[in-house]
Amino acid sequence: MPNKDVSLEREKKIIDWLNHCTPQAEAIYLVGDVFDFWFEYQRSVPKGFVRFLGTLANITDQGIPIYLFPGNHDLWVSDYLVKECGVTLIREAHEFMVEGKRFYVHHGDGLGPGDFSYKILKKIFTARSARFLFQWIHPNLGIALAHKLSKKSRLAQNPKEDHYLGNQKEHLSQFVSQHLASVSPPGEKPDFYIFGHRHLVLDVQLDTARYINLGEWLYGSQYAVFDGESLQLLQWPSQQPAKSQNQQSIGK
């Protein structure tokens, strides 16, 4: 679990970004792994996010919708953020029409071919019985255990997956290609696929669509902006174009 000062610095960074976006935003989309771990006990939630949660509530109070797609780290997000912060929770892939462009949005976990072990684990952990059983573990133990497992998961990540593997090996690239081929008529094909699970900054042209991966905020800080005409991937706080790790220059 990161130390308190580092966690607070990261929290302030994303709050600054949210406050920067709010005056111009018609909607804000958070595509998962916002929390390293989250579980809502009947009478308690994980501490340490007061400023962030207050910022979310302030934004939705202004009438700006915030859509949250839970990721594999925060898949147990439930109705606390909905009731207390006004966030709209979306668990499955969802399509949005914005200024005539179609956006396909999802965290990205479990999509595409392969990765069967994770898909099985996801079914287990998203089952109501798993949540019911976990709630009987005291929060002090349960949350500490979850953070330890999360850290172990990051350390065990295959170093070969720290860079773009190419369209034929990337699960999400394969998913986008397969999904595009399955959509009919052509006018209903998404223009953009927005994901976050890969934790790499990617901007990949696949047939008629762009596959965008938003990177991460643990070490980097990238985000996408759509102004009604074009989509840019930017770096925070510089607001300069981000560089995708599939060797394409993006944000132009």
What is each model feature region?
Residues M1-N3, S238:
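Short polar catalytic/cofactor-binding loops
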Residues N3-V98:
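Core catalytic region of metal-dependent phosphoesterases/phosphodiesterases
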Residues I28-G32, P65-N72, H106, F192-H197, ...:
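Active-site neighborhood of phospho(di)ester-bond hydrolases with catalytic His/Asp-centered motifs
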Residues L75-D79, V105-H106, G112-D115:
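Short, well-ordered, mixed-charge alpha-helical segments that flank or form enzyme active sites
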Residues F96-Y104, L206-R210:
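Beta-strand-turn-beta hairpins that frame and shape the catalytic cleft
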Residues G108-Q174:
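Active-site-proximal loop/helix segment associated with metal-binding centers of metalloenzymes
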